[in-house]
Amino acid sequence: MMKFMCIFICAVAAVSASGYGGRRPSYGSAPIGAYAYQVQPALTVKAIIPSYGGQRGYGHNQGGYEAAPIASAYGNADIGNQYGPVSGSRYGGAPPVDREAIALAKLALAAPSAGGPLVWREAPRRVQHAYGPSNYGAPQQRYARAEEAQGASAAAASSSVAGVAKKGYRKSSY
């Protein structure tokens, strides 16, 4: 899926950056390919910045956008004669969205590592046992956990109940 997305973005960048079909209306004054190029991982190495005049930009003779090192786009450094300083007439500087994106990227890289993934630990579930008739209309009788007979006491209780059922009801003579 990632490979497909990269191929699609590159195709959009190539189509909108080419001069085929003359000057087309696009997003603002920049062709969409200029923004699609910045989505690529090469953002850390190069940026597309406006170039005015000359025959080197994506817009050919009418200016347009050109790939240049990030340092020349976001700093005042002069990167040789090829790119020149940012404040010159050749480059118009980076759009404010790009400055914000770079600032957020630097902030994210400076943040401490989050560590391992968060593990959700559920509390143990308590199952309520229901005894009595299983008819849909009849209410079920529920016993508290302390009232349930367990182990030997369950056997004793059942034998005493079975004995009482055969002999009938008797008063205890205390």
UniProtKB/Swiss-Prot annotation:
- What is one term from the GO cellular component aspect held by the record? extracellular region
The UniProt annotation puts the region (Disordered) at 154-174
Task: Name where it's found.
Answer: Secreted
User: Signal peptide: which range, if any?
Assistant: 1-17
Instruction: Please give the Pfam families that the UniProt record associates with this protein.
Output: Chorion_2
Q: Which UniProt keywords apply?
A: Secreted, Signal
Low complexity: bias regions: 154-165
InterPro entries noted in UniProt: Chorion_2
| UniProt entry tagged with the keyword Nucleotide-binding | no
Q: Does the keyword Membrane apply?
A: no
| The protein's role, per its UniProt record | Chorion membrane (egg shell) protein; plays a role in protecting the egg from the environment.
Q: Provide the family line.
A: Belongs to the chorion protein S15/S18 family.
Name this polypeptide is given: Chorion protein S18
Naturally occurring in which organism (per UniProt): Drosophila subobscura (Fruit fly)
